[in-house]
A protein has these predicted regions:
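Residue-level detector of beta-strand structural context in well-folded domains
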Residues: 71-72, 115, 143
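A short helix->loop->beta-strand "cap" motif at the edges of active sites that frequently abuts
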Residues: 50-52, 122-123
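Pre-active-site segment of Zn-dependent metallo-hydrolases
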Residues: 13-25, 83-84, 88-101
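Active-site neighborhood of phospho(di)ester-bond hydrolases with catalytic His/Asp-centered motifs
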Residues: 5-7, 31-37, 53-58, 83-85, ...
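Active-site environment of divalent metal-dependent phosphoester hydrolases
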Residues: 10-14, 39-42, 59-65, 88-93, ...
C-alpha cells in the first residue's frame, strides 16, 4: 500500500503547481494523508477522488475544523498510524506528539515545514515538510509511506 503524505499546503485556492506535484508523486498512491494547515477545502480537489485522511492544523479556519479533527488514528493493513498537525515551537514537538498517541507504529505530523523520517521510542515520526512554503526549511517536500510487512517512509524533495 502506498500513501502520499502532504502537510502545510497553506493555499487559499486550487493551485497548478500543487496539481503537478500530485501528478508527479502521488499518481500511484492508494491513499492521501494531509497533516493539516490545508487552509481551504478546495485545495483537496487536486487529489481527484483518492481516499483522503486529514486533520486540521493551527492555521485552518472553522470550515476545515468542522470537517477534520485535530488528531486521529487510522489503521491500514494492521498498522495503526497517528495523524496530527502539531503546535507550538518546533523544539520538543516530537516528544509532545508522541505523548498524544498510544500503541501506534507511526505518527504523521506537520507544522514545522521541515521534513523528518526518524524512529523514536519505536515509533516512526514522519513529517513530509511543506510542498509550498519553505520559510522554515531549506527545501519544499512531500512524503511517501509504503506499508507492507513494515512501514517505510521516504521524503521527496521538490526543489
Amino acid at each position: 500500500m502506498k500513501i502520499g503524505v502532504i502537510s502545510d499546503t497553506h493555499l487559499n485556492l486550487y493551485d497548478d503547481r500543487l496539481e503537478q506535484i500530485v501528478a508527479d508523486h502521488f499518481e500511484s498512491a492508494d491513499i492521501i494523508f494531509h497533516a493539516g494547515d490545508i487552509v481551504d477545502l478546495a485545495v483537496l480537489d487536486v487529489f481527484k477522488g483518492k481516499q483522503i485522511y486529514a486533520v486540521s492544523g493551527n492555521m485552518d479556519p472553522d470550515s476545515i475544523r468542522a470537517v477534520f479533527p485535530q488528531k486521529r488514528v487510522v489503521e491500514i493493513e494492521g498498522w495503526k498510524i497517528g495523524l496530527i498537525h502539531g503546535w507550538g515551537s518546533p523544539p520538543g514537538l516530537e516528544d509532545k506528539i508522541l505523548r498524544e498517541f498510544e500503541d501506534v507504529a507511526c505518527i504523521v505530523y506537520g507544522h514545522t515545514h521541515r521534513a523528518m523520517n526518524e524512529v523514536k521510542d519505536g515509533v516512526l515520526l514522519f513529517n513530509p515538510g511543506s510542498p509550498t512554503d519553505r520559510r522554515f526549511a531549506r527545501h519544499n517536500s512531500v512524503g511517501i509511506l509504503n506499508i507492507g510487512r513494515e512501514i517505510r517512509g521516504t521524503i521527496v524533495p521538490l526543489d
